[in-house]
Amino acid sequence: MPKTVETRVGVCYNDFKYCTKGETGMLISLVVPCYNEEESLPIFYKEASKIAQQMEISHGADFEFIFVDDGSKDRTLQIARELHRKDARVRYISFSRNFGKEAGIYAGLKAAKGDYVATMDADLQDDVDAMDRMIDAYEAGNDIVY
């Protein structure tokens, strides 16, 4: 019996060795579930990269971006691949079909290597600037920040 395309589920298509830790030894993982985000993903990446650069300076932290393509029908996966080729901090996971946002978040959390892990939607409904405040709140002693 031939393999179905569903055997790809949960398989990461890139190498995780590029993830490093900054001067403070802190790695921040940003898990981004994506479904048909071809228009918003480049904008999200641009905005999140700005914040990552600021936090690398302010906190001495390194970032990894984990884009989880949840079986998109548009160019979301191709865009994630392009971002990975241009930026070693970018990783991606591709599902063979749509399994839902929760499955995407779970796969991203399992793949995350960071000391801190945040999830954020690619549609920019959440303020990307909140990342800095969230890390500060966590470092102030909170167990969970949202």
PLM regions: where:
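Proline-rich intrinsically disordered, low-complexity coils
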Residues: 2-8, 24, 42
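Structured catalytic core of nucleotide-sugar glycosyltransferases
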Residues: 13, 22-146
